[in-house]
Curated annotation (Swiss-Prot):
This is Probable transaldolase. It comes from Maridesulfovibrio salexigens (strain ATCC 14822 / DSM 2638 / NCIMB 8403 / VKM B-1763) (Desulfovibrio salexigens). InterPro entries: Aldolase_TIM, TAL/FSA, Transaldolase_3B, Transaldolase_3B/F6P_aldolase, Transaldolase_AS, TSA/FSA_arc/bac. PANTHER family: FRUCTOSE-6-PHOSPHATE ALDOLASE 1-RELATED, TRANSALDOLASE. GO terms for cellular component: cytoplasm. It is an enzyme of class 2 (transferase).
């Protein structure tokens, strides 16, 4: 299972990279706006820092606008993946970009049928948002199970990229179901190594070592 970092913050990217926990990065307009300054320079810096895929999102509403923006964003680096919204126009753009050999990440997916359409259009990744579904009293992880079943039934090469992850259990459930990628905020990825029994065990070992060396 791959871990992507859901951020536009270079410091977070470097920390996760140093831990060996980052296979790629996903961004969106909101994340880039939080960093301030020139978004183009920030996006280019991220592409230069990250060896794996970097998702950069188009904001146009028509397929023509999305394709035009995608061509610009693709110039930021060979590792750019174009984030496209799950709309009818987005599907047109996805299919066109697929024919041109441009990798895409269809985002804002909330149903298995949306994921199926994205896969048929040639999406490289599909991003179901589990946390947002949980937030409206739906089972976000059930969506991942349904998409996994559909993709396995028909051997779609499209990767399931679990998004809107809000806590470590989302990561665990994604791994158990067999999702290909989880894109994780740094605030969550920094919790994955923690366990109270690990802390308790270390404290006991250290206390015993101090006794031994006195």
């Amino acid at each position: 299972m791959e871990f992507f970092l859901d951020t536009a913050n270079l410091e977070e990217i470097r920390k996760a990279k140093a831990q060996g926990l980052m296979d790629g990065v996903t961004t969106n307009p909101t994340l880039l706006s939080r960093e301030g300054g020139d978004w183009r320079k920030q996006a280019e810096a991220i592409c230069a820092e990250v060896e794996g895929p970097v998702s950069l999102e188009v904001v146009g509403e028509s397929a023509e606008e999305m394709i035009r923006e995608a061509e610009d964003l693709a110039s930021f680096g060979d590792n750019v993946v174009i984030k496209v919204p799950m709309t009818n126009e987005g599907l047109v753009a996805t299919e066109s970009l697929y024919r041109k050999g441009v990798k895409t990440n269809v985002t804002l997916v909330f149903s298995p049928l949306q994921a199926l359409l994205a896969a048929k259009a040639g999406a490289t990744y599909v991003s179901p948002f589990v946390g947002r579904l949980d937030g409206i009293a739906h089972d976000g992880m059930e969506l991942i199970r349904q998409i996994r079943t559909i993709f396995d039934n028909y051997d779609f090469p499209t990767k399931i990229l679990v998004a809107s992850i809000r806590h470590p259990m989302h990561v665990l459930d994604s791994a158990l179901i067999g999702a290909d990628v989880a894109t994780i905020p740094y605030s969550v990825i920094s919790q994955l190594a923690a366990h109270p029994l690990t802390d308790k065990g270390l404290a006991a070992f250290n206390a015993d070592w101090e006794k031994l060396t006195k």
